[in-house]
Amino acid sequence: MNTRYATCYVCDELVYLFKKTFSNMSPSAAAFYQRRMAIVKNGIVLCPRCSSELKIGNGVSIPIYPHRAQQHARRSR
């Protein structure tokens, strides 16, 4: 299966939804993948930064404030 991408719901950052990994992958390549791996919570795709900032748990909805999402997107680029 090929690599699949998605965009973060909050900041539109491109993240890996699926990537075939190999046991002989270099540590730097594995770290790169881990930093850009999608986190899916309640059917919503998030980047690691947005997921940690929102601290979403089971049954918790995501409050989206457009101005905050734009500020976050500017910081991450």
Curated annotation (Swiss-Prot):
Top-rank taxon: Viruses
Function: Plays a role in the production of occlusion bodies as well as expression of the polyhedrin gene.
Name listed for the protein in its UniProt record: Protein AC43
The species this protein was found in: Autographa californica nuclear polyhedrosis virus (AcMNPV)
Organism ancestry: Viruses, Viruses incertae sedis, Naldaviricetes, Lefavirales, Baculoviridae
